């Protein structure tokens, strides 16, 4: 359990570095946030920050529902984070990354299949958000709608959005989403279009 805001931000930074090292995002792409549990305060990466160079000073402090003025310039995707926190009171962390295989499969019209128990347990289902301009109200609103039913969503021709009760779970889901996409791609290369994790088996392990 995280006892302080500083511990939450430190966890966010660690998992952001891992996300870059894993190839889930490059350069200044992506944005992440963490909410202080039980409050309307959250911290989101500032505009233009690189996720592998984050420090505690790389975050803007926000309040859910705030539209400005801001003490620091938040990521251009702050509306997406804000809308999801408003929609999901159980969510304390949001990762918006750019997993290339997941985005590619979606763009080509292929459904991402689950092959492992972790995929089925932690990802469970994947929402799809049609393309909308970066930072737009339309993107934020549709992402929040998808997150009413899913913990992971593909943002068409853009990236993914994953949520969790803490940064570790939000990152885990993003990583597993891309793993499932890569395995789907490999299966397709081998000519397989049907194999997937047995339906309902994950309930035994929940």
Question: Could you say what each language-model-derived stretch is?
Answer:
Residues 1-206:
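Glycine-rich flexible loops
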